[in-house]
Amino acid sequence: MKLRGLYAITDSQLLSGKFLSYVEAALDGGVTLLQYRDKNSDESRRLREATELLKLCERYKTRLIINDDAELAARLGVGVHLGQSDGSLPDARALLGHKAIVGATCHGRVELAEQAKADGATYVAFGRFFNSLTKPGAPAVPLDLIAQVRARVHLPIAVIGGITLENAPQLVEHGADLLAVVHGLFGAENTQEVTRRAKAFTALL
């Protein structure tokens, strides 16, 4: 599957009070994948928000991905992103079917990406590459890892961790396919700035 572009990831705290307006502003600027990431245990709220996001994604022809919840993804007929401790990738693939997007966190280890590919992943994700507000304690990953992954694992590569418009070009130059961005996109002061940033990230790819 050809996946390339901006991979927008929601943050419930960052987007409190402006959730849908900021997401729509990003979609208006151009988003390849939108990941709904919410660690809250309120299942009814998560279903409601994910359903609202799916409606927006369908309008803007963007693919929705659910973080860490294959059952919710199956219920909505969308993709899922799994961390290393978020359940079985083969089980998620079996549940969602062969056409669904299933992404895998690989931190900074190429062998995890090789295993993810064998297990049926659609794309592999690496990071953090820069200082991250979302995961400040995550170990840093060197830029040259992207080329190593490209040589050994022939899947789209998502990169994450402190990505801004200033440092994103380095990642693209090293071979990244998907720029996974949270604060660098949604940390804007208004919806117009979110759209501007989304367009600028998309233009890099």
From Swiss-Prot:
One of its GO terms (molecular function) is magnesium ion binding. Binds 1 Mg(2+) ion per subunit. Belongs to the thiamine-phosphate synthase family. GO terms for cellular component: cytoplasm. InterPro entries: Aldolase_TIM, ThiamineP_synth_sf, ThiamineP_synth_TenI, TMP_synthase. Pathway: Cofactor biosynthesis; thiamine diphosphate biosynthesis; thiamine phosphate from 4-amino-2-methyl-5-diphosphomethylpyrimidine and 4-methyl-5-(2-phosphoethyl)-thiazole: step 1/1. 4-amino-2-methyl-5-(diphosphooxymethyl)pyrimidine binds at residues 35-39, 67, 105, 135. It is an enzyme of class 2 (transferase). Its EC number is 2.5.1.3. Its cofactor is Mg(2+). 2-[(2R,5Z)-2-carboxy-4-methylthiazol-5(2H)-ylidene]ethyl phosphate binds at residues 132-134, 162. Condenses 4-methyl-5-(beta-hydroxyethyl)thiazole monophosphate (THZ-P) and 2-methyl-4-amino-5-hydroxymethyl pyrimidine pyrophosphate (HMP-PP) to form thiamine monophosphate (TMP). PANTHER family: THIAMINE-PHOSPHATE PYROPHOSPHORYLASE, THIAMINE-PHOSPHATE SYNTHASE. Transmembrane segments: none annotated. GO terms for biological process: thiamine biosynthetic process; thiamine diphosphate biosynthetic process. It catalyses: 2-[(2R,5Z)-2-carboxy-4-methylthiazol-5(2H)-ylidene]ethyl phosphate + 4-amino-2-methyl-5-(diphosphooxymethyl)pyrimidine + 2 H(+) = thiamine phosphate + CO2 + diphosphate; 2-(2-carboxy-4-methylthiazol-5-yl)ethyl phosphate + 4-amino-2-methyl-5-(diphosphooxymethyl)pyrimidine + 2 H(+) = thiamine phosphate + CO2 + diphosphate; 4-methyl-5-(2-phosphooxyethyl)-thiazole + 4-amino-2-methyl-5-(diphosphooxymethyl)pyrimidine + H(+) = thiamine phosphate + diphosphate. This is Thiamine-phosphate synthase. It comes from the Bacteria. It holds the Pfam family TMP-TENI. Keywords: Magnesium, Metal-binding, Thiamine biosynthesis, Transferase. Mg(2+) binds at residues 68, 86.
